[in-house]
Structures are given as C-alpha cells and as structure tokens.
Amino acid sequence: MLSRLQELRKEEETLLRLKAALHDQLNRLKVEELALQSMISSRREGEMLPSQPAPEPSHDMLVHVDNEASINQTALELSTRSHVQEEEEEEEEEEEDS
C-alpha cells in the first residue's frame, strides 16, 4: 500500500513536470503566433496603401520569430515510462544503501 502511494506520488511529480514543460512550449508557440499575425497584418496594410512607400522596418519594429532549430532545442520527454523506471532504480539503490 505504501509503495503504491509512493509510485503515485512519483507519477504525479512526473506529470506535473510534463505539464509545466508543455505549458512553456504552448506559451512560446502563442508568442510566435502573435508575431506572425503581426507580420501578416503589417504586410496587408502595406498592400492596401500602395500609394505610400513601405517604410523600412526599424530594428525595434522587427519581431524575432523562433526558427525551427531554436524551437527544437527544448526536448520534451513525453514518455514517462523511462523516467519512472529511472526513479524506481534510484529508489531501489537508496533502499539497498539503507
């Protein structure tokens, strides 16, 4: 009974870490989406006003959009099985040391 409770607590911790990682990634994607929407709307405004020359975007106006390489730098471990197994092995080692 106690070991099952410990397993559930470890699983909960793993799921909470996974939730946080996914939440961070979701926030990054939302920021990127807003940046892309801003770029699209500014281009549409430029197309609607062809009589005026398009202003050169200043450095402050440029929106940094993550490229694929920087997005992929964040590795998400969606498989909790390997993490749980590692924790179980660590727990067994601790029990053996006791």
Curated annotation (Swiss-Prot):
> Could you describe the subunit structure of this protein?
Part of the SNAPc complex composed of 5 subunits: SNAPC1, SNAPC2, SNAPC3, SNAPC4 and SNAPC5. SNAPC5 interacts with SNAPC4.
- Coarsely, its chief localization is nucleus
User: Any idea which GO molecular function terms this record carries?
Assistant: RNA polymerase II general transcription initiation factor activity; RNA polymerase III general transcription initiation factor activity
Cite the residue spans of the region called Disordered. 75-98
Acidic residues biased stretches: 86-98
Extract the InterPro entries matched here: SNAPC5
Source organism of the structure: Bos taurus (Bovine)
Question: Does the entry feature the keyword Cell membrane, yes or no?
Answer: no
- Entry keyword Nucleus: yes
Name under which the protein is recorded:
snRNA-activating protein complex subunit 5
Cellular component terms, GO, for this chain's entry?
nuclear body; nucleolus
One GO term under biological process is:
transcription initiation at RNA polymerase III promoter
Question: Where is this protein localized, as stated in its record?
Answer: Nucleus
Q: Which domain of life is it from?
A: Eukaryota
Q: Which Pfam families match?
A: SNAPC5
Signal peptide as annotated in the record:
none
Function of the protein: Part of the SNAPc complex required for the transcription of both RNA polymerase II and III small-nuclear RNA genes. Binds to the proximal sequence element (PSE), a non-TATA-box basal promoter element common to these 2 types of genes. Recruits TBP and BRF2 to the U6 snRNA TATA box.
Any idea which UniProt keywords this protein has? Answer: Nucleus, Transcription, Transcription regulation
